[in-house]
Amino acid sequence: MELKNGRPGDLSGRFSREIKVYDLLDDLGIEYMTVDHRGAPAETMEACKAVDEVLGTVMCKNLFLCNRQQTVFYLLLMPADKPFKTKELSAQINSARLSFAGPEQMEQYLDIRPGAVSLMGLMNDTENHVNLLVDEDLLSEEWLGCHPCVNTSSLKLRTKDAFGPFLGAVHHTMTPVHLVGEP
């Protein structure tokens, strides 16, 4: 795996959802780096660890959640080494107990499949069905690693660009949360 500036040189055989991410970042003038791992999709946290070492970023856990009634959806970004406690997060956002949303909603709202959940999917949520929650520990990092809506490539971009110009362009806001991962 090799880290390269900007979009991959060869876009043949790539999904349109991936190319759409590069197009938006380029249009916004956001600098980013990519690494391809097409032969080894980052489907597990173990696989992501190897990619994040190449990216030089903190490994991020991206969880697609919903309330019990499946009427409110959340994308939670948090450090991978923190345990996720639904009760802790539910209390902070004043929501009924949260659970993992299904792949159908993930594809419907973010145009992403399981294993590729990413902040970049918010560009496809044009009606703002998904609320972005970000653990404050990630906000203090200089760099953020994420998928370009597929798990066969990864991006490295400045955290300030991800939560500034990118979020503004896709008409989303972020709610910082403080997670400690304790019962």
Identify the function of each model-found stretch.
Residues M1-P183:
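Extended, low-hydrophobicity, polar/charged segments
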